[in-house]
Swiss-Prot record:
Disulfide bonds: none annotated. GO terms for cellular component: cytoplasm. It catalyses: L-threonine + hydrogencarbonate + ATP = L-threonylcarbamoyladenylate + diphosphate + H2O. One of its GO terms (molecular function) is tRNA binding. Its EC number is 2.7.7.87. GO terms for biological process: regulation of translational fidelity; tRNA threonylcarbamoyladenosine modification. Its main location: cytoplasm. This is Threonylcarbamoyl-AMP synthase. It is found in: Cytoplasm. It comes from Shewanella sp. (strain W3-18-1).
Amino acid sequence: MLQLHPSDIKDIVLNGGVIAYPTEAVYGLGCDPDNDTAIQKLLAVKQRPWQKGLILVASDFQQLLAYVDESQLTAEQLEFAFSKWPGPFTFVMPIKAQVSKYLCGEFDSIAVRVSAHAGVQALCRALNKPLVSTSANLAGEDPALTAAEILADFTGKIDALVLGELGEQRQPSTIIDARSGKILRNGQ
């Protein structure tokens, strides 16, 4: 498994690779959100059913516009999300028609976050698009907190490990339904 800095990851991701990378709280697994083969590989590595959907993480909201149907949200709903970003808040938003079922699962919405983590922002800026994000663990297991855990659990299963530090968060992000304002998962 390659161990690289965020700036060196672009070609791996855009060519269908699956990576592990540090986020605000835990290591994440990620891939190109526009590559169904890469998404299916990520789901297989994690042993996660596609029906559950995945999160997209971005460096800014503009990167999410190809996936989120903002026309279904009011100005107030968008302003609420913008007031929490960048930060540890994931919003469930309506999807555009062309979004892959492997991203949204059985839902008519997608979970999105604008990250405050410098490494995640650097990855997304290098890709010029969001990154699929899910915790680096097998379904039902605890997420990886160290590079050593990634190497032990995912060598031979993923293409690269992004070097860097975890953020200060110790809980997963809070998930909020952007349309209703309902908290779906309390984090932080």
